[in-house]
Amino acid sequence: MSLPSLANLPATLLPAAERAGTALRSAVAALDAAALARLEAWPEERLEDFRRVAAASDFVAEQAVRDSAMLLELAERGELENPHAPGELRSQLQARLEDCADEDELGRRLRRFRTRQQLRIIWRDLTRRAALAETCRDLSALADACIDLACEWLHRRQCEQFGTPIGRRSGEPQRMVVLGMGKLGAVELNLSSDIDLIFGYPEGGETEGAKRSLDNQEFFTRLGQKLIKALDAITVDGFVFRVDMRLRPYGSSGPLVYSFAALEQYYQDQGRDWERYAMIKARVVGGDQQAGEQLLGMLRPFVYRRYLDFSAIEALRTMKQLIQQEVRRKGMSENIKLGEGGIREVEFIAQAFQLIHGGRDLSLQQRPLLKVLATLEGQGYLPPAVVEELRGGYEFLRYAEHAIQALADRQTQMLPSDEYDRIRVAFIMGFASWAAFHERLSHWRARIDWHFRQVIADPDEDESGEAACGSVGAEWIPLWEEALDEESASRQLADAGFVDAEAAWKRLSDLRHGPQVRAMQRLGRERLDAFVPRLLAMTVENPQPDLVLERVLPLVEAVARRSAYLVLLTENPGALERLLTLCAASPMVAEQIARFPILLDELLNEGRLFRPPQAAELAAELRERLMRIPEDDLEQQMETLRHFKLAHGLRVAASEIAGTLPLMKVSDYLTWLAEAILVEVLELAWRQLVQRHGRPLRADGTPCDPDFVIVGYGKVGGLEFGHGSDLDLVFIHDGDPQCETDGGKSIDGAQFFTRLGQKIIHFLTAQTPSGTLYEVDMRLRPSGAAGLLVSSLGAFQRYQEQEAWTWEHQALVRARVLAGCRRVQASFEAVRAEVLARPRDLDALRTEVSEMRAKMRDNLGTRATAAGTASNAFEATAAFDLKHDAGGIVDIEFMVQYAVLAWSGEHPALLEFTDNIRILEGLERAGLIASEDVRLLQEAYKAYRAAAHRLALQKEAGVVSGEHFQTERREVIRIWRELRLG
């Protein structure tokens, strides 16, 4: 955001500006005549800047007089008008400390350097030469440099006295690690921040190399004490930074310094919610950077839970309530950091999402608040309009905070009550009056507070933040807590709409007394007791409460020991409502969520849930997720792939249930999902094998890249994938099977590609905590189960031309490349076209297709109706197998396959697509099947598949009663006969 332009100095501030100018001139004149000449050579713009800044900031006015030589030097070096390059602050301080002789001198030089930089930073901030980001960055870089260089200097001096601390386990020299917390950690320091620090060291041991040794704990405690003194002590030169150590374990009562093991143990066993919040922004600001990153890695699981963690909202809400109580107690409503709509509320909003989702969405594991807000927008957690308001309000508040602190270099966020200071703050912010400034400030605070309440507020509070008179589900509390006898409980359930009230009561009682609930800790039990009444209240709003309760309670039992999921649903009534709707519509969805509760996350965002992404977006999203995971972390890669598949599968099912996705699009999305996963699985498997064995070679000796394709047959090849469909795959390579790979542990090409195929199958079928990706069927490869797992392109072509049965050519109609090398894909498509289009004896072809179809009906069709051919097949008491009986799905597929094999030689356009609907369109365009018959076949095919999809969502077989689809079946049988297929 941008502030209003700086106006002319208000009349009230003109005397202060004149006094400051006169005092500066006198101070410079007292130096020498040359100094005065240098001042008089200042351009008018700089003199005007000085008058403005000095009138607005007592600190600048006083320091300019106290050390006018410093101000002249800053001006002549261009530091007032130009930004510092990265690393420049550190370089300047390093040069100033080079010949530092003792600790007193260290303190003096640090303080003078801080004063110099503080003056420069305030000058640039108040003259608008520096944007907010630069000001915060420079202040944080100043703190980093002072902390790290002072720590380095003191460590060196202490080693001379007591020897070098050595790790007992590693035998390596040890250095202290300084973690910067809060605004320092996030590179967001304000003009007069204190700095929150935590000290650690890698491991216990003792010093070596001096007459008197210390154990490492004592060595680093002394070092920490000296560092605090060097930075925090107030002397005639002022201070460097106020140091706050209260964020360390046990606060002020705990040791000053901790070993890494002690820190990890503390946070694992005793870490509190507010400490997770504080640790989000932790950054290594001094000491051993490499060891510090190791420490942060050890603590990351404490901060970011791998499951959805809505308990974070409870913690943030509690913290906010405590802050509000303190604000009210101390009359701090005018505090722009802690008051309503203040800076802290924006931070809480961002950190709520980080703590809830950051364990799974690694893009949220970052420190700067504005970057987090951008990620929340980019990843769809918050709408752009909300992020724009939060960003604008936050920046306005931070500018105002700097304006207040610039007055006297004092740590405060309270709006001034003094009229003179109010005029100064309004002037700095670019407003003509305090009233105009305060009106804009109030606007931003109101917007921030409104958004804060949407994210953090208790769902049982009203808009004022007070507890609502009757929280949702309060009428069900006595029943759940068994304050009612069984008869009264059943009556309440029946009155609320349950058909079988006794069964509903038994289910609730079984849950309450079941082993999962009995084993819950107190906090989890409290969460369950808060959730179940809310669940019952929303269940009775559904037209099928018995069914909903039956399907949802297994989920409640499944997550009982991970009660954060109960908090998620309690905190998000919309998500709970969507859960009940989906469970009522589909037992498959209910069981999937109960088995993988992490899917509850998908229910939070209604827009995302019912709008699955397009193919390119799917692939890009998966690629981005995997790129955030270290290449050697196979376990996390496998889990990410599985969660991605589960999440998007749920989104497709939800869209199907809601009616926002038609059948053809459902299959498209599920097919695209499989394709995106196969592309990444191939990449993972290829990378692993190449790292171990090197790359396989082509016949000309050049390396393969990867010269391998995954071919999809059946439903995935025909873009007709369904929920729970298997992958029918064939692997083909075009490398040299005899040539050895070019790596250290070389193997021949045939071995390499076989192992590549095995690894792909393993990645797809391996059982992990998030289940498997897909079941894989490789029986359509050349020679079936007896054939090689991976065929060379040449071998595949020879097999198709010389050995393949007609039914294998039928299968080839639906075959297409899903992932792999474009060159080999083009070669495969050429082989496919050549094989399918070759001339055939049509009588022999009809016989072979008919015989194969008859064999399938005999084995897979409904026996009681002779696979739909008997006279009773159309009776209501009969069963019709949508796929295998006469007039069903397979009949249509066989007709399409017959047509391609019979006529694609003369009509090559029939080979363009692999899905039945578009091949039928091609047959119509070629005049091979009448338009009316094509419409009949297409509509019947879509109707059958839609019914099969609906049954799959109900976990039922693809069978309906014989009275269904009678017209469609008869027409399909008629067309089958007209094609003389038996």
From Swiss-Prot:
Native organism: Pseudomonas aeruginosa (strain ATCC 15692 / DSM 22644 / CIP 104116 / JCM 14847 / LMG 12228 / 1C / PRS 101 / PAO1)
Name of the protein this chain belongs to: Bifunctional glutamine synthetase adenylyltransferase/adenylyl-removing enzyme
Top enzyme category: transferase
Keywords for the protein's UniProt record, in alphabetical order: ATP-binding, Magnesium, Multifunctional enzyme, Nucleotide-binding, Nucleotidyltransferase, Transferase
Known EC number: 2.7.7.89, 2.7.7.42
Encoding gene (name): glnE
Lineage, opening ranks: Bacteria, Pseudomonadati, Pseudomonadota, Gammaproteobacteria, Pseudomonadales
Cofactor requirements of the protein: Mg(2+)
Adenylyl transferase as annotated region, ranges: 473-982
Keyword presence, Endoplasmic reticulum: no
Region of interest (Adenylyl removase), ranges: 1-460
Catalyzed reactions per annotation: [glutamine synthetase]-O(4)-(5'-adenylyl)-L-tyrosine + phosphate = [glutamine synthetase]-L-tyrosine + ADP; [glutamine synthetase]-L-tyrosine + ATP = [glutamine synthetase]-O(4)-(5'-adenylyl)-L-tyrosine + diphosphate
